[in-house]
Amino acid sequence: MTETMLTPSRLWRRMAAEQRHRVARAFWQDEEAAEDQAQAMLLIAQQKKFRPKTVAALDDDRRARHLASLATVPNTIAGRALIAYHLAEHRAMMAAFLDGLGIAHDNGLIKEEHVKPDAAKIPDAVKQLSQKFPEEDVKLYLNTLLCQDPDAWAALREVPAVAGELRPEGMASAAERG
């Protein structure tokens, strides 16, 4: 069976409406996302049949609602939104996971580039994370890591919460089939 590649856009499509709204709100509040925000405003204008000027005049919450209502967004926007969301709302979870892996970080941000976690530590780190934080938040975070750097985080594919996201909808894993 061919493995489906998980992308930020696919992850966006699979999020619940409320979760997508929280991610979109963090995206509009990210001061470093101006270029992606401009692209998102044009996308909203196009999809909702608004003038770009109208979208630009909306407050962040209204833009977030409009963006969250789009079933499909480009990988660049979805990826940036997911990063903004985790940095804004889930630094404690990010830090706890990196601590569990023994990876040096600054409040959840990995200090060095090109860090590859020890695959043997991942199951325990995920278990600890799952005991401290809501399942949907953990699942979204782990899948975001895998989307952002599939080579470094390849071992996450073996984690049940992540592996379920990689299967095409409706397909059972080998473990589920018995």
Model feature map: region roles:
Residues 160, 164-178:
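Short, charged, intrinsically disordered terminal tails
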Residues 1, 10-14, 115-116, 128-129:
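A short, ordered amphipathic alpha-helix with a cationic face
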Residues 30-155:
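Acidic, low-complexity, intrinsically disordered interaction modules
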Residues 7-10, 17, 60, 164, ...:
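Intrinsically disordered, low-complexity regions enriched in serine, threonine, proline
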Residues 3-36:
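Charged, amphipathic alpha-helical stretches
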